[in-house]
UniProtKB/Swiss-Prot annotation:
Residues 88-128 are annotated as: DNA-binding. It holds the Pfam family HLH. This is Aryl hydrocarbon receptor nuclear translocator. The gene is ARNT. Residues 167-171 are annotated as: Mediates the transcription activity and dimerization of the AHR:ARNT complex. Residues 1-97, 465-492, 672-789 are annotated as: Disordered. Residues 26-35 have a biased composition (Gly residues). One of its GO terms (biological process) is positive regulation of erythrocyte differentiation. It comes from Homo sapiens (Human).
């Protein structure tokens, strides 16, 4: 029962064991059951503590695994450490290897750059790519393949090698030679050595270059031909860059293969005759102007200075083999110097061109604002004879002609105002041998760019050749005085269509006037031109109290027009006559019209211009003109010869009062010779200071008759009693009146038809002098009109 009771428990506890127990035998089953029970009892704790048992076993396994893992980890860490060390060492070794490789490559690149001349000539060290590129170019140039194609199909377009060689030698003005660097033996020399050194080619072949140069230049030549690195000591002059380089790595570059050579040496000059036909023109000139080193003694060789320029090349060239009989055939690859020798003709002391050198004709000087020399060019010695120290500190005006000193001062003042613009002036400069030289000075100022102040004046002084034939220039602000021809006395109102008949009429009238050559030599720029006035101011006198040409304003106009005596101040205002109207046409008659409130006096007029004195007096001129113009009139009023004092500049100013009159009266007063007779109105008697008054002429139609008692100085000057007087002079009129003066009323006479016109050229010369003006009142009018007007 116990077994049976135990079995359910066992089956309940262990379901998997139930079928096994039920299927067992009885006998053995009891024993087995007891055994099973015992095993079951033994297993129960085991089953109760299954986890523990399993845990214990697991713990044991974990311990074993942990130990093994630790061992494995330790072993693995050792392996990893060893591998990391190996990798690190490998990386370090690789970096070291790369660094060594880079250092080697840099060293080779540096050495290559030292061997290539174009790399060393650069201002700074080039990069590696540039060094390699230049090295390739240099190697191509050494092999002679720099300008040829790789397939060898390149050929010159139209020149052969010989033609190209001759052109190069002629352009280089020298001869080509090739010498061995080791021995100095001449390998080749061109035929152009004959006109250069007067030596045939045969004298150079078979000899050495040391035999052809001066003995003192042998050592220098040996240094230039040497290719060893230690041959050159000291400093090197790089002719391409113009810099002096110290001894060092650059020396190896200069002495290696392919480096450039340029040196000067003295070479032997032969005595062979040169045929000018067989050589070119430059060679013939070279033969005559060879650069000798002084006089040559008999029996001594003659040396000349030769400039040699070339390169060190490999010999023999690539692809060329020397013949077996050549002494240098078995020595392997050698070097040679390929160079061109040229004469130093420009420094020849005995050249014939030196005697024909033109002396300098200009020098540059610097002055302060006052004109004192602060710098003088050395060419002043050949130009004016002075040393620079003789001119420094002195004023340029001191060396100027007295007549040109003011002109030079004005030019310096003007150039200061121009501020940088060039001003030229010509003056006479006293040279050291006390001769006057015409100098043209072009000057301009230099301004400080910061302070804008004038620092100094720079002058270029040029000695002018044939100065007597050149006109003397003036400043830009100097008044020009051209000498005009017979058209100078045309009034401004004259139209262009009236010019031809006007000139013909004036030429006819001037042919019968004595001394007419003097009338055409006056300057029209000094004549007062008529002024066009409009509005109510046309009838107002000017309020200026000082005449335009008064003596205190411009002394040049103090001497003015003697021997012209008429009321020519009564010109026509330009506003009253159109430009196309014929002036002073013959045959015009003017009706008699009274002229109220006007004072007309017989006066000698002195217009403010300078004119050459005619040979005859004005009275004789008037008499001859009147006799020629109307010989039928016979009434003769006599002029009383009197002595009259000369007028002053203030009396000239009395002519400037503006009195208004109509055009017909202005023109009519010049239509007949009687208008030049003495006339007066009540209240305005004629007066002549210190002399008797003119007798009145009652016959207005009479003409002037010739007088035999008149002298040349009879009517030289008269009092300037013109149309009116200035307002401040009106109160002084009683002082100038004469007690014996008579009053007459002038009646304008009617002109006879066909009566010729006289004194038109005088009227047109004077223009309208009834108004005095200046540039301040009429700013748009020029006081001195140009010749074209």
């Amino acid at each position: 029962m116990a077994a049976t009771t135990a079995n359910p428990e066992m089956t309940s506890d262990v379901p998997s064991l139930g079928p096994a127990i039920a299927s067992g035998n009885s006998g053995p089953g009891i024993q087995g059951g007891g055994a099973i029970v015992q095993r079951a009892i033994k297993r129960r704790p085991g089953l109760d503590f299954d986890d523990d048992g399993e845990g214990n076993s697991k713990f044991l396994r974990c311990d074993d695994d942990q130990m093994s893992n630790d061992k494995e980890r330790f072993a693995r860490s050792d392996d990893e450490q060893s591998s990391a060390d190996k990798e690190r060492l490998a990386r370090e070794n690789h970096s070291e290897i790369e660094r060594r490789r880079r250092n080697k490559m840099t060293a080779y690149i540096t050495e290559l750059s030292d061997m290539v001349p174009t790399c060393s000539a650069l201002a700074r060290k080039p990069d590696k790519l540039t060094i390699l590129r230049m090295a390739v170019s240099h190697m191509k140039s050494l092999r002679g393949t720099g300008n040829t194609s790789t397939d060898g199909s390149y050929k010159p377009s139209f020149l052969t090698d010989q033609e190209l060689k001759h052109l190069i030698l002629e352009a280089a003005d020298g001869f080509l030679f090739i010498v061995s660097c080791e021995t100095g033996r001449v390998v080749y020399v061109s035929d152009s050595v004959t006109p250069v050194l007067n030596q045939p080619q045969s004298e150079w072949f078979g000899s050495t270059l040391y035999d052809q140069v001066h003995p003192d230049d042998v050592d220098k030549l040996r240094e230039q031909l040497s290719t060893s690195e230690n041959a050159l000591t000291g400093r090197i002059l790089d002719l391409k860059t113009g810099t002096v380089k110290k001894e060092g790595q650059q020396s190896s570059m200069r002495m290696c293969m392919g480096s450039r050579r340029s040196f000067i040496c003295r070479m032997r000059c032969g005595s062979s005759s040169v045929d000018p036909v067989s050589v070119n023109r430059l060679s013939f000139v070279r033969n005559r102007c060879r650069n000798g080193l002084g006089s040559v003694k008999d029996g001594e060789p003659h040396f000349v200075v030769v400039h040699c320029t070339g390169y060190i090349k490999a010999w023999p060239p690539a692809g060329v083999s020397l013949p077996d009989d050549d002494p240098e055939a078995g020595q392997g690859s050698k070097f040679c110097l390929v160079a061109i020798g040229r004469l130093q003709v420009t420094s020849s002391p005995n050249c014939t061109d030196m005697s024909n050198v033109c002396q300098p004709t200009e020098f540059i000087s610097r002055h302060n604002i006052e004109g004192i020399f602060t710098f003088v060019d050395h060419r002043c010695v050949a130009t004016v004879g002075y040393q620079p120290q003789e001119l420094l500190g002195k004023n340029i005006v001191e060396f100027c002609h007295p007549e040109d000193q003011q002109l030079l001062r004005d030019s310096f003042q003007q150039v200061v105002k121009l501020k940088g613009q060039v001003l030229s002036v010509m003056f006479r400069f006293r040279s050291k041998n006390q001769e006057w030289l015409w100098m043209r000075t072009s000057s301009f100022t230099f301004q400080n760019p910061y302070s804008d102040e004038i620092e100094y004046i720079i002058c270029t002084n040029t000695n002018v050749k044939n100065s007597s034939q050149e006109p003397r220039p003036t400043l830009s602000n100097t008044i020009q005085r051209p000498q005009l021809g017979p058209t100078a006395n045309l009034p401004l109102e004259m139209g262009s269509g009236q010019l031809a008949p006007r000139q013909q009429q004036q030429q006819t009238e001037l042919d019968m006037v004595p001394g007419r050559d003097g009338l055409a030599s006056y300057n029209h720029s000094q004549v007062v031109q008529p002024v066009t006035t409009t509005g109510p101011e046309h009838s107002k006198p000017l309020e200026k109290s000082d005449g335009l040409f008064a003596q205190d304003r411009d002394p040049r106009f103090s001497e003015i027009y003697h021997n012209i005596n008429a009321d020519q101040s009564k010109g026509i205002s330009s506003s009253t006559v159109p430009a196309t109207q014929q002036l002073f046409s013959q045959g015009n008659t003017f009706p008699p019209t009274p002229r109220p409130a006007e004072n007309f006096r017989n006066s000698g007029l002195a217009p403010p211009v300078t004119i050459v004195q005619p040979s005859a007096s004005a009275g004789q001129m008037l008499a001859q003109i009147s006799r020629h113009s109307n010989p039928t009139q016979g009434a003769t009023p006599t002029w009383t010869p009197t002595t009259r004092s000369g007028f002053s500049a203030q009396q000239v100013a009395t002519q400037a009062t503006a009195k208004t009159r109509t055009s017909q009266f202005g023109v009519g007063s010049f239509q007949t010779p009687s208008s030049f007779s003495s006339m007066s109105l009540p209240g305005a008697p004629t007066a002549s200071p210190g002399a008797a008054a003119y007798p009145s002429l009652t016959n207005r139609g009479s003409n002037f008759a010739p007088e035999t008692g008149q002298t040349a100085g009879q009517f030289q000057t008269r009092t300037a009693e013109g149309v009116g007087v200035w307002p401040q002079w009106q109160g002084q009129q009683p002082h100038h009146r004469s007690s014996s003066s008579e009053q007459h009323v002038q009646q304008p006479p009617a002109q006879q038809p066909g009566q010729p016109e006289v004194f038109q050229e005088m009227l047109s010369m004077l223009g309208d002098q009834s108004n005095s003006y200046n540039n301040e009142e009429f700013p748009d009018l020029t006081m001195f009109p140009p010749f074209s007007e």
